[in-house]
Amino acid sequence: WDYASNVSSERLTRLANSGAEHLYVCPGVQGWNQLINKYHEAYENISRMARYGHECHAMGLLNTDWGDYGHINHPDFSRIGMIYGAAFSWNADILPEEEINRQISVLEFGDASGKLVSVLDLLCHQDAYPWRTAVMVQEALELHQDKEEAAELLRSCAEGDADAANASI
């Protein structure tokens, strides 16, 4: 398994070349700690892992959907990533991202414009206060009783610097 959007084939190739049998690739739908899944990252991860699986003659693809801290995203938001996995695991000719997103928008969601998945992908990157940060602040307040740590996290988020807030965790 590897959930990075820029995952390389190195580890899977080493396993395949070592004679390991029963290889599976396990990408993810990119919904953990997210209200709306990260669809571009899911496309990159799932398409790469599926391609590597085809190249290394993997027995299958296990597309994962899991969550941290309560799995806050609605299961319907994972459908797009699940469709990526279904399409790519059975067909080595992987569609370009824009085309499969258009097809999913039309076929799965009945969106005649073909733009719904692209809009959802924009929305998933608009969180001003990431769920992971909210959980860490809560833990700092309740578990560690570290009010200064929680205050620093809140300041970083209030200043719009979610990356700094997450880095301080």
Residue ranges and their predicted role:
Residues 1-169:
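Substrate-binding groove of N-acetylhexosamine-processing glycoside hydrolases
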